[in-house]
Each structure stands twice: as structure tokens, then as C-alpha cells.
Amino acid sequence: MRHSIGLAAALLAPTLPVALGQYIRDLSTEKWTLSSRALNRTVPAQFPSQVHLDLLRAGVIGEYHGLNDFNLRWIAAANWTYTSQPIKGLLDNYDSTWLVFDGLDTFATISFCGQQIASTDNQFRQYAFDVSTALGSCKGDPVLSINFGSAPNIVDAIAQDSNSQKWPDDVQLTYEYPNRWFMRKEQSDFGWDWGPAFAPAGPWKPAYIVQLDKKESVYVLNTDLDIYRKGQINYLPPDQSQPWVVNASIDILGPLPTKPTMSIEVRDTHSGTILTSRTLNNVSVAGNAITGVTVLDGLTPKLWWPQGLGDQNLYNVSITVQSRGNQTVASVNKRTGFRTIFLNQRNITEAQRAQGIAPGANWHFEVNGHEFYAKGSNLIPPDSFWTRVTEEKMSRLFDAVVVGNQNMLRVWSSGAYLHDYIYDLADEKGILLWSEFEFSDALYPSDDAFLENVAAEIVYNVRRVNHHPSLALWAGGNEIESLMLPRVKDAAPSSYSYYVGEYEKMYISLFLPLVYENTRSISYSPSSTTEGYLYIDLSAPVPMAERYDNTTSGSYYGDTDHYDYDTSVAFDYGSYPVGRFANEFGFHSMPSLQTWQQAVDTEDLYFNSSVVMLRNHHDPAGGLMTDNYANSATGMGEMTMGVVSYYPIPSKSDHISNFSAWCHATQLFQADMYKSQIQFYRRGSGMPERQLGSLYWQLEDIWQAPSWAGIEYGGRWKVLHHVMRDIYQPVIVSPFWNYTTGSLDVYVTSDLWSPAAGTVDLTWLDLSGRPIAGNAGTPKSVPFTVGGLNSTRIYGTNVSSLGLPDTKDAVLILSLSAHGRLPNSDRTTNLTHENYATLSWPKDLKIVDPGLKIGHSSKKTTVTVEATSGVSLYTWLDYPEGVVGYFEENAFVLAPGEKKEISFTVLEDTTDGAWVRNITVQSLWDQKVRG
């Protein structure tokens, strides 16, 4: 049966914007089934969901353990239909009825009441379809059916069409499934070098039936809330003395009211204090949007800052739309913050030159008018199936980011545009999100239909997330300019200028105006890695003139993207790029034994077993073969060389212990290599390149396999994340040993905005822990003062000048103690950091058994660790399966007699506390010992 509006009012979705005369049915409350000819049966389904997950819940398939990702390809090759049970209780007296889908993945045909309504082909768009006529002719309660076509089959058919766009051979990059560039779907669904290829399908975001019961009734589809300084332009530094401007624009479904008014109320979320209530000016109606603006003259809201730079002050903004008769038509609430964020790509000024900064152009971020050092990593999709990514999981992941002293994540394309709740978490925790449009490592079609489709995608998502203070940037895509255009130049030199034109047509002439038309507060870069622009002329057909192939000697432009799998130069500072900002760099490693055991049988836990090799997708298969041993051997060999070149080679008699030791060894190499690069990049803040950012690849894993991640699937920290937490502290001391020339320099680097002063103690020990006579000719303590956002060399020598009896039996311990003011703080803070240097590679050191002892404190989650007989390098505390968390300190150095009390933060425990009895400790010595 159907209901009147009075009875239905109680069913309004409580989290949706409120509007006049609407009835909303959340389709997740309905019962659903999933069917396919490939399955020949019907199973219960959820909504939102994806096919693989419903089949898993129904017991049709198992988890993708072992090589089961290959065995599940039949799912991606089939068409699947989600069908609702008859939907009861819709209104009889409605003016119009709509189906609203916040996300369909991807090629979907929608039927309602037995009538085909529409087809969709973009995972990232919101769709609304008028089904009033279909419902009116429906005999009985309506049934909604959504048929999802096989994405691999559909894009293959598009590619084979003679009218489809073609590209030069050897340009496009295929990981597993081919032809991903023809679809507006998560590109990594077709495989990447760190994850599987499931090509999932399904209603991956919520959907609603919306009924409007009056002609003036509306439904709010999307809201664009833009907060910026008066006169602010996306590509110019905002004037911080100007008042704030609030621009509110609401996209509605239904008839636009004539001569509407708009008002806002701005309330402090912490205190509840109202900052202002006012009517908006210049209210306009265009398309399906109602827009108004106001200037907050004389008001000084508390600013939002990234973590480590200040507080995350947030405000609730209530936006109300009223009709000509002062009746409320719609009301929307958005939580936001007052901040400016600006990507500075302007030319180096004479004043900067006078400070010692090399010529060229800037490439760094400024928040609220302040330069800062961006410390962070790259975020990939946290799961192969977005519908099982929870707010709890993302909150835990972002907590690890904050604890890890990171203030920025690059949201890599091509995954998916992040859900609103993920931006909410970033707002709360102070994590800036460099965001990108979902185009990656490919050339894409440039026909009008494709461009029209992606234009709608971009407008929707730019408007959707614009109110979040954590939003830091929009980039057009991943490595299009730095990788794909050079690939064209190599493969088809005569066509290079044509494809540059195609690139500019899409990423500059189309995307840039779409961003600028919908936000004044966010900068835009056409690609993740560029050399910046020559000039911007918004009236020109190509409004941003890019700087391609810069070769100006002594000048620095743009950001850098760096991967070098030649392990012989892993610690050669001369092999690292010198630039203004490092947005992507890294090397892969194995996950821990505990994580492997979640997905791989015991008999397969060998370093080069078939299962381990085939779960390694670097180098990628480049197609759908299931025997990618040759390409995988490249990546496995790179990890092997990283270990054997620098670290003791594990050789345990028990194959599980040996496998675990090898996994750990690859993590040691990875962590040391990243540490070496980040120390180099951070030191660059005080060098002519004025380097102000390092975002390593990558934050987290999508499954259990070798990858570049610092956090494994399931939440366990690799050595990498612990080391990054240490080296991203505000003030650090770093040794720089040039193994070719023998030079040894020690630098102090600071991210603070004002000078910090203190001392660095330099202590030479042999590996038994005895002081080296005369401290090897090195001063025992060096005072220093380091400027804000700067670095300073505090000591330098050559190894040949040191009084070291044996460089293989020596370690330099560096202990920094300083005082300084954290950004936006009036108090002086004590700052400490410890580091070390050896003048031989770990494999060549004459290490001794450090005699590690571990004890349990009266506090259940605290342990004490002590070295009794030698220097413990790479001291590593580990915990068993059944618990997830992290030690407050790990991967550290202990001298004999030194004792550390270290707490463990428990995030999840299924052992009822028994895990504490199985904490272990090891060091580099254990990697060397045969057993």
C-alpha cells in the first residue's frame, strides 16, 4: 500500500538535508537480491554493496586468499542484477518521484516498475531520474532493478569499435585488465602494481527514492560552500588582511523558487557560540543551483590549521533557502573551517634570491599565509571494495597519520573520490588532503561525449567536498604530464605536439575552468608532477601555459617523482632529485609474517614460492596471465638485492623463521632508504632548492602482498611507519655520509616557524658499547641555532680524519636537545631527537650479541627493553597475531646499560590481553645469527 504525507513524514532520512514537502526512502532499508546467469541462482544482497561481497556473504565464494583473486575473475566477466523486493509505502499524492543514486559502479541499466529508466557509465557521478510516469502506471508496489554490465567486457568492446580513439603503440599502461582508459571507474580496479584486479560492480553508494508532494517542493542534491578571503584568486596568494567571504550554492531537484532568499548561521562547534547570522546577498538562480554570498566584515573566526601547526577549529554553517513568501524551502548544515590554502608556483623573487634561494619558481603550500613543510605520504584505496571501508577503519588509519607526525596525504588517482566522512575525519585530525581527479598513467579519450561525462563528474565532486578545510589542492591526474607525455614522445615523436594539445584540451582548457568556476579557495595543478606554469591567462584558449622539459641550469621548477630500483645507488645522495617538493618516491618491501599468514597457507611461506611471487605485482603482468613469474621476479629480485647489498643475509633452518627474517630484512632496507631520502629532502629546506615537502609512496596496503606501504593490510605498522614517525619530528639531527668521498656531515633541520636552539651530543662507541678513545677526534657536544623552516650544518669531517681504529666496529650516536616554539604557540617547548651513523653497511659491521632483555611493567601495555652486552641496532619490538596496535617507539638503537620503557597502544584485541606474554624483541644481530 501507499501512504499519505503525514504518515510518511516519520520516515525521512535523518542525515539528509531538510527541504519542504519531501518524502525520502533510503533504499538501504529495502530487501535486495543478487542474480546472474553466471551464477544460476539468486542470493540475498545488501545495499550499498558490491557483487563480490554479497557472494562472499552468501558463501558462494571465499576470501581472496592464496591465488583466489585469479579464481574469482568469472565474477567480473558476468553481468549482475540487483533487484529489490516490492517497495511498499510510497506516497499516492505526490507531484513527482525521483530515483537518486549517489554512486553506481559502473555500467548500469536501471528499471523501475518493469520499465527501463536509464543507463549510467560513471562510477563517480550522482544521478537523478524522474520516475513519476513509471510509478503512476505501476500495477502494485514498484520493484527496482539495476543490471550491472561486465566492465572488462564493455571496455573491450569499446576498444574494438572502429570509431574509438586509438593511441600509439607502447604508450598505454596495462596492469591486468586492458582498456581501463575507456571507463569512468576506479582505474586500480583493473589492477595496479600494489594490488589485485577484481573489477567490482554494484551500487557502491547510497540511493534514495525522493517524492516531492508539492509543486514548490525540492530535494537538495549537493552543496558547494566556499570560504575564502575577499579578492582571493585560486592561483595568487590570498591577502590575509581581507575579511572572509562565504559563498553558498545549493543544487536542488525540483522547481526552482522564484526570487528566493538565503541566510546562514555560523556556530562554533566546540563552544556552540554563534559567530554570525545573516542574509546572503546577490542571490541568483541558474541551472539547478541557488547561490548567495556574504562578506564577514569585522569578524575574526578562529582559524583551522593542519596538525602540528595549530588547532583544528571548526564551525557549523546552517544554510537556509526561503521562497518569496518566507517559507523555508531547504536547509543544509555543513561543518567547515576558516583557512586559506594556496599552492605557490610563482617565480622566485629577488628578495628570495637575496636569501640564497636558487632561481626558478616556487612549488610549495602556504596555509593561512604561512609557508610550511608538508610531511606525509600517498593514500591509495584502503580496500578492494569500498563498501566495506568503515569510518572506524579510516579513523584508525588517520590516527596513525597524526601519530606519525604527518600533516598531508596525497589522495592518489586513480582510486575513487573520497567519501564525505573521510574528509570529515581529516578536518577533525588536521590532515591536509591533496586531492586528484581520477585519471592515472594513461591517455584518455578526448571526444565530446567523454569530456561531457567527466565534466559532470568533476563539477559534482569539486562542489561536494569544497567546504572541507582539509582539502588542499585539486590536481588533474597522476603522472599524466611527467610520465605519459614523455612516453608519447619516445614512442611517436611526430605525434608529440598533437598529444600535448590533447592533454591541454582536457586537463587545462576543460578542467581548470571547472575548478575555478566552483571554488575560489583551492589551487589547481593539471598533473601530480609538473614543472609548474609559465603564466596564467584565463581569457586564453589554454588558460595555463605549462613549463615542459625544463633544462635551465641552476634553476629549479616544480615537484619531483622518483623511483630508482638500482639498489647500488639507494643511499647515494647524488641520485636523489633536487627540487622544490617531492610528491612520490619509494621502494617496495614484504609485509610481516603475521600479515602473510592471514592470506597464505603455511606451506607457501617461502620468499620465492609461487603464491608469494604471484601476489607480488611489481613488475605487473601487463595482461590476464596467471603465471607472471618473469615480471614478478624483477620486483622480488630488487628486494633481494636491497637486502644482500647492505644487510646480513638471513639463514634460518626453520622455513617460517627464515621467511619472517627475510620479510623483516626487506623492511629494514625500505625504511633506511626512505629515511635517507627524507633527511635529504628536509635538509633541502635550507638549501638553494628551498625544498618544502616530502610525501612518500605509500601510506597503506590494499591487501596482503609486497608493496611500498608503511602500514600493512589489517593495520600492523611496518618498520617504515615507525621510522617515518621518528624522522618527521619537528626538529631532527641527521648524519650525511658520502661513502664515495668519505665526507661526514651532521645537519639539524627544523620545521618550526621561528629559530630553535640547543646542543647535539656526538658519541662514538664501538659495537660492544665502549667509548672510542678521544671520541675519535669528534667534539662531544656542538651548540646550534637553526632558523625557522631551515637547516644548518653543525659538524663536518672526513672519515680519513677520524681516529677510528676500525670503521666496521664503530657507531656515532647523535642526541639533540633543543628548545623552540611550535607554530601558533606562545610557549617554549623542549625538543629531543636521536639518530646514529655507521661508516660501513650493516652487513659488514662487527656486531655482537646485544643481550637484549625484555621485561613487563606493572602497566599491562608497557614493556622495558635493555641491551646488556653490546649496541643493539634496529631494535625491534613485535607483537603476535590477535592484536592490532603500535609501540610508542620502535626500530631504535640501544647502547649497553640503556633501558627504555615503551608503551603499546591497543587498537584491537581478540586475545583478552594474552598477547602481552608473546611480545618479542630482536635486533640486527638476530638477522645475522644462523638458526
From Swiss-Prot:
Record flagged with keyword NAD: no
Complexes and interactors: Homodimer.
Superkingdom per UniProt: Eukaryota
UniProt keyword terms in alphabetical order: Carbohydrate metabolism, Glycoprotein, Glycosidase, Hydrolase, Polysaccharide degradation, Secreted, Signal
UniProt enzyme class: hydrolase
Biological or metabolic pathway of the protein: Glycan metabolism; N-glycan degradation
The protein's name: Beta-mannosidase A
Main location: secreted
Source species of the chain: Aspergillus niger (strain ATCC MYA-4892 / CBS 513.88 / FGSC A1513)
Residue positions of the active site: 479 (proton donor)
Localization, UniProt: Secreted
Catalytic activity line of the entry: Hydrolysis of terminal, non-reducing beta-D-mannose residues in beta-D-mannosides
Record keyword Signal present: yes
Family: Belongs to the glycosyl hydrolase 2 family. Beta-mannosidase A subfamily.
Role noted for this protein: Exoglycosidase that cleaves the single beta-linked mannose residue from the non-reducing end of beta-mannosidic oligosaccharides of various complexity and length. Involved in the degradation of polymeric mannan and galactomannan.
GO molecular function ontology, one term from the record: beta-mannosidase activity
Annotated signal sequence range: 1-21
Sites where a glycan is attached: 40, 79, 247, 282, 316, 326, 347, 550, 608, 658, 738, 790, 798, 830, 918
GO terms (BP aspect): glycoprotein catabolic process; polysaccharide catabolic process
GO cellular component, one term: extracellular region
EC number: 3.2.1.25
Taxonomic placement: Eukaryota, Fungi, Dikarya, Ascomycota, Pezizomycotina
GN (gene name): mndA
